[in-house]
Structures are given as C-alpha cells and as structure tokens.
A protein has these predicted regions:
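N-terminal positively charged helical leader segments and presequences
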Residues: 169-172
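Short amphipathic alpha-helices in soluble, non-transmembrane regions
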Residues: 152-158, 185-194
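Short amphipathic alpha-helix segments
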Residues: 143-161
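Terminal, non-globular segments
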Residues: 176, 183-185
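Short glycine-/aliphatic-rich beta-strand segments at the starts of folded cytosolic domains
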Residues: 131-146
C-alpha cells in the first residue's frame, strides 16, 4: 500500500486584494499547524482592520482535509466563507487559513458579486504565496548504552538519517526524523546495522515495526520509540 506523506501548503502569510464598486476585499492567507493557531491569526487581522465591515474566513487542516470551517461573518449565507474554502480546495491546499476583510463601498454587490469578490481575493492571495509540497515525517527517540554509541552513530551516518537532537548523560538519547513512507524500512535497516545482522535475520527478530515499538525494549542495549 502506497503511503501518501506529502501535502500542499503555503510557506508564509500572503495577501491578495480585489475591488468592486467601491468595496475593497483584502485576503490574508497563512499556514497553520493546528486549529488553535487560527483564532490568534484572526484576532490579529481584526486588530489591523478595526473599521472593516466584515472579517470572513475559512480554514482546512489535516491530510484528509476533514477538519475545516467557513464563516460568513454577517455576509449573506454562503457568499463568503464557502467561496474562500472553495479556493483553498481549488489550489489543493491544506493546513491553511484565510481571512478576508471587506470595506464596504456603498453599493450592494448582490450574491454573485460577493461570491466572486471573496473567491478572487482569496485566489490572488494564493497566487502571491509560495506553495510547497511538505513532507510528513515520523519522529523517533533512540536510547542506548554508551558501548553501543559507535554502532548507533555509524548506522545513522550510513543511512543519512536526520538527527534532531542529541543528549549524552547516563546514557545516549538521540531524536531523529524519517520520511513517513520510508520510516519502517529505514528503522529495519538501522536495527540490522546495529545488530550486525542481515535484513532477513533482523526481520525474524522483529515481525514488524509496530510490534517492535509496542513491545518497547529492544535487545543489544538499544531502545527505539516512536514519538
């Protein structure tokens, strides 16, 4: 089974503007890591635009995109939040939030005009953004006795595993990150190198990565846990 471990998002806050019949729409798009990030961003935009008539928004989170919200903030139902969310989806993004502030120009735009304005301002913010494919990584912690340090460090180097942190007190503790789709095989190869056994022999000791992590302790003075 193929593991999908990338998603499209933006790297930093970007801005898009749209004007129609005197009304001005300013869209602010920002990357999100969790739902709790968005209220802070929304409050920041509100403080920057206290005289705006509306602060409409939408966000989507997660690999499956099942976590989302859209809000019209007083605009006619379905004319603001949904068009904003629609552009998030049209650009194929997730872990993204957008706030669009509207300054009323004195002329009503009607339902179709509002939908077009919120859609276009959001699209412009995304056109101004740097869109990237972000890789999802698994984080592991390796604990080991000092006599295993040469084997552990050699295995990490040979497999070019990314080291996040190192701590050497009573024992060695190293945190590493591995691309999610490659983590099971990489950990298997790491174990084989440290054990000085073949992949086949190592597989006989460890039926699967999940079994190994669930059981906790591992032989040969090395302990690996998934964080």
């Amino acid at each position: 089974m193929t593991i999908i471990d990338t998603y499209k998002t933006i790297t930093s806050t970007s801005i898009g503007e749209f004007k129609d019949k005197g009304s001005k729409f300013i869209a602010y798009a920002t990357p999100l890591s969790m739902e709790g990030d968005f209220p802070l961003f929304l409050e920041k935009i509100k403080k920057e635009h206290p005289k705006a008539r509306h602060h409409c928004f939408a966000w989507r989170l997660g690999m499956d995109g099942n976590s989302y919200r859209a809000n019209d903030d007083g605009e006619p139902s379905g004319t603001a939040g949904r068009p904003i969310l629609g552009q998030i989806d049209s650009f194929g993004l997730t872990n993204v939030g957008v706030v669009v502030v509207r300054y009323f120009g004195g002329t009503l735009l009607g339902t179709s005009g509002l939908i077009a304005a919120y859609k276009e301002s959001t699209a412009e913010a995304f056109r101004q953004a740097e869109i990237i494919d972000k890789i999802i990584e698994d984080i592991f912690e390796i604990k080991f006795e000092y006599d295993k340090m040469p084997d552990v460090m050699n295995a990490l180097k040979r497999l070019t595993i990314n080291i996040l942190s190192q701590n050497f007190n009573e024992s060695g503790i190293i945190k590493i990150s591995i691309r999610q789709s490659e983590s099971e095989q990489t950990i298997l190869h790491f174990r084989a190198l440290v054990l000085k056994k073949s992949i086949e022999e190592t597989q006989m000791l460890l039926r699967s990565l999940e079994d190994a992590l669930a059981s906790g302790a591992w032989q040969e003075g090395v302990f690996i846990s998934k964080l």
